[in-house]
Design a protein with these regions (language model features):
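Class I SAM-dependent methyltransferase SAM/SAH-binding core
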Residues: 51-102
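A short glycine-rich, Lys/Arg-flanked "PGG" loop and its adjoining helix->strand segment in the class I
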Residues: 128-140
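Core SAM-dependent methyltransferase catalytic element
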Residues: 194-209
Length: 209
């Protein structure tokens, strides 16, 4: 039986070039995302530990952005095709194939973790495990920025994403899961992307307790 990780990896490996071309400059039209990522980078630098992981890095464009913002950033992704593309596009940066629930990082090693829409394909019942893993690799006071599709519903909503099945989350519910994992949410941003998806673009910033 094919699990959701295998399905997601295969699906993204099949759209590497298309995905990279669509998202390479996407943040130029997303000022809210740029602001949250910039704030995240500033706060990570302030911890004195600039080492940061871009989990679910895809073609590596946000890893490069974090590097430009002064972080010692590296990228991790489930899809080997995405990692190959990222290495070719950004040869000076480090990229490695990895699963988000089993990161190849020592305990308390990072000042920051960026998860930019990279947890959206995880079934709700498995998300606590993923969040606990992000908490494990963060040093005390380290930062996690999670970006996701938000919903006004009370529970996560499954929908047919163009690449693989995905879930939108109520921000309050996801904040509770972050807190349960030892990650204290202290800032959030939700906005309407003026699209026909029917979801909010949502961002939660949390600090490792």
């Amino acid at each position: 039986m094919v699990n959701h990780q295998d399905e997601t990896r295969t699906a993204y490996d099949g759209v590497v070039e298309l995905y990279a071309s669509l998202f390479a400059n996407r943040l130029e039209t997303q000022p809210f995302s740029r602001t949250m990522i910039g704030t995240f980078a500033e706060l990570v630098r302030a911890t004195g530990n600039p080492r940061a992981a871009d989990v679910g890095c895809g073609p590596g464009h946000l890893t490069a952005m974090l590097h430009e913002l002064g972080l010692d950033a590296f990228g991790l992704d489930l899809a080997p095709g995405m990692i190959d593309h990222a290495r070719q596009a950004h040869p000076a940066l480090r990229f490695q194939e990895a699963r988000m629930e089993s990161l190849p990082i020592e305990d308390a090693a990072l000042g920051g973790v960026l998860a930019h829409y990279s947890m959206i394909h995880t079934p709700p019942g498995e998300l606590p495990e993923l969040l606990a893993e992000q908490a494990r690799v963060l040093a005390p006071d380290g930062l996690l920025l999670v970006s996701f599709f938000g919903t006004d519903e009370q529970e996560p909503v499954r929908f047919d994403h163009k690449v693989a099945p995905a879930y939108s989350w109520p921000a309050d519910r996801l904040a509770e899961l972050l807190a349960d994992a030892g990650l204290v949410p202290f800032a959030r941003l939700l906005h309407d992307p003026a699209s026909e998806r029917g979801f909010l673009d949502a961002h939660l910033l949390a600090r490792r307790s």
